[in-house]
Curated annotation (Swiss-Prot):
Lipid bilayer topology: Peripheral membrane protein
Record GO terms (molecular function): ATP binding; proton-transporting ATP synthase activity, rotational mechanism; proton-transporting ATPase activity, rotational mechanism
Organism: Saccharolobus solfataricus (strain ATCC 35092 / DSM 1617 / JCM 11322 / P2) (Sulfolobus solfataricus)
Primary role: Component of the A-type ATP synthase that produces ATP from ADP in the presence of a proton gradient across the membrane.
Any one of the GO CC terms: proton-transporting two-sector ATPase complex, catalytic domain
Protein name from the UniProt record: A-type ATP synthase subunit E
């Protein structure tokens, strides 16, 4: 073998070794590049998912807040209209006190209460419009004093002086009690319900 052949053989061998090493280096570089790429994709995918979850939570929170606000607004509106009904009913008391049933009821209450008091002094409070009617019902009973209360719309309050007890038969109190007990039914009638 001559020198040139030997040199060619050596060069070919070195060339093959370099080629193999370059191929290995290229494979390693591609592997590192793919790993880096996958890591970056994974990190950003995780961040995007976290942002999506956070945004969904914010949206759900806002949705819940709006639902509560809507319910509160509806309740305020319902309360407004229920109070309007109450005001209208309260305005009708003037018509109620003109009826025979009202006068009969007051007479029955006074008769019953006066029978129970015997010798105790009582004061009956009534609206200015009812004073004459009450005085007529009481008659000449010296244990009963009739006084007016400008705040009363109708009905009576009986104050027992010895015991300090007051029995309230005022229409406003009765209306308040009935209205409070029927508030749910009134709401159902106005806004639908059960």
């Amino acid at each position: 073998m001559d020198f040139e052949q030997l040199l060619d053989k050596s060069l070919n061998k070195v060339r093959e070794e370099i080629k193999t090493e370059l191929s290995k280096s290229l494979d390693e570089a591609i592997k590192l590049l793919n790993e880096g790429h996958n890591k970056i994709v994974q990190e950003y995918s995780q961040r995007i998912n976290e942002l999506i979850v956070k945004t969904k939570e914010e949206i759900e929170g806002e949705k819940a807040r709006l639902e509560v606000e809507n319910k509160r607004t509806l309740l305020v509106e319902k309360e407004y209209w229920i109070n309007k009904v109450y005001e209208r009913v309260l305005g009708k008391i003037g018509e109620v006190v003109k009826t025979k049933e009202y006068k009969d009821a007051i007479e029955n209450i006074i008769s019953k209460e006066i029978k129970e008091i015997r010798e105790e002094k009582v004061t009956i409070y009534c609206s200015p419009n009812d004073k004459l009617m009450i005085e007529k019902i009481v008659g000449n009973n010296k244990n009963v004093t009739v006084k007016t209360d400008e705040k009363m719309l109708g009905g009576i309050k009986i104050y027992f002086e010895r015991s300090g007890l007051t029995r309230d038969f005022s229409l406003k109190l009765i209306l308040d009690q009935v209205f409070d007990s029927m508030r749910g039914k009134i709401s159902d009638m106005l806004f639908g319900g059960k």
